[in-house]
Amino acid sequence: MLKFLKQVGDYAKEAVQAGRYIGQGLSVTFDHMRRRPVTVQYPYEKLIPGERFRGRIHYEFDKCIACEVCVRVCPINLPVVDWEFDKATKKKKLNHYSIDFGVCIFCGNCVEYCPTNCLSMTEEYELATYDRHELNYDSVALGRLPYKVTDDPMVTPLRELVYLPKGVLDPHDLPANAPRPGARPEDLVEKTEA
């Protein structure tokens, strides 16, 4: 009988220990459930890139003088400039200009050193395609006006992705009425005024 009671006691101890382990695991789960999400609902919410963001390059064909400075300063000699010398005007005539964004490292040297400012960086960063050859933009594709996140009525532009305010190291120290991630400054002002 003592052996049976010892087995029951050991079983009870193991059951309590198993319950503690499960409780520890669930405490971590519940701890994360109380935290605020850090995600952005991407197709419908997009972060507005910073002022100096280096996105897709915009090209103005009329300003280009075919000097090929962009090719010389590019670390990978990426822009392809095709020109011919016009004997009548004694100037270079630009025939074709293209950049392959599948290879481009978006360093911005071409934009910085262009003497006529025909190249500029845009805030467009959605360059995904199914075929890498579609990333080779010619002068027509480069000349398209850049897409702006703030102009799309179907997208909620987010100024910044807010998770923890400055100085806060533990997410559990935040008050319940703290701003959610991606809150726009206008929304924050409305909440503080209310």
Swiss-Prot record:
Q: How does it sit in the membrane?
A: Peripheral membrane protein
Which GO terms of the molecular function aspect are on file? 4 iron, 4 sulfur cluster binding; iron ion binding; NADH dehydrogenase (ubiquinone) activity; quinone binding
Domain (4Fe-4S ferredoxin-type) spans: 55-84, 95-124
Report residues binding [4Fe-4S] cluster 2: 74, 104, 107, 110
Query: What cofactor is needed?
Result: [4Fe-4S] cluster
What is written in the cofactor note of this entry?
A: Binds 2 [4Fe-4S] clusters per subunit.
Give UniProt keywords alphabetically: 4Fe-4S, Iron, Iron-sulfur, Membrane, Metal-binding, NAD, NADP, Plastoquinone, Quinone, Repeat, Thylakoid, Translocase
In terms of InterPro entries, this protein maps to:
4Fe4S_Fe-S-bd, 4Fe4S_Fe_S_CS, NADH_quinone_OxRdtase_chainI, NDHI
Q: Name one Pfam family in it.
A: Fer4_7
Q: Name one GO cellular component term.
A: plasma membrane-derived thylakoid membrane
Q: Where is this region: Disordered?
A: 173-194
Basic and acidic residues bias spans: 183-194
Q: Mind listing the GO biological process terms from this record? A: photosynthesis, light reaction
* Xref: Gene3D superfamilies: 3.30.70.3270
Its Enzyme Commission number(s) read 7.1.1.-
Subcellular location, in the record's words? Cellular thylakoid membrane
Q: Which reaction does it catalyse?
A: a plastoquinone + NADH + (n+1) H(+)(in) = a plastoquinol + NAD(+) + n H(+)(out); a plastoquinone + NADPH + (n+1) H(+)(in) = a plastoquinol + NADP(+) + n H(+)(out)
UniProt function note: NDH-1 shuttles electrons from an unknown electron donor, via FMN and iron-sulfur (Fe-S) centers, to quinones in the respiratory and/or the photosynthetic chain. The immediate electron acceptor for the enzyme in this species is believed to be plastoquinone. Couples the redox reaction to proton translocation, and thus conserves the redox energy in a proton gradient.
**Subunit comment for this entry?**
NDH-1 is composed of at least 11 different subunits.
Q: Which family does it belong to?
A: Belongs to the complex I 23 kDa subunit family.
Name of this protein: NAD(P)H-quinone oxidoreductase subunit I
Q: Which gene encodes it?
A: ndhI
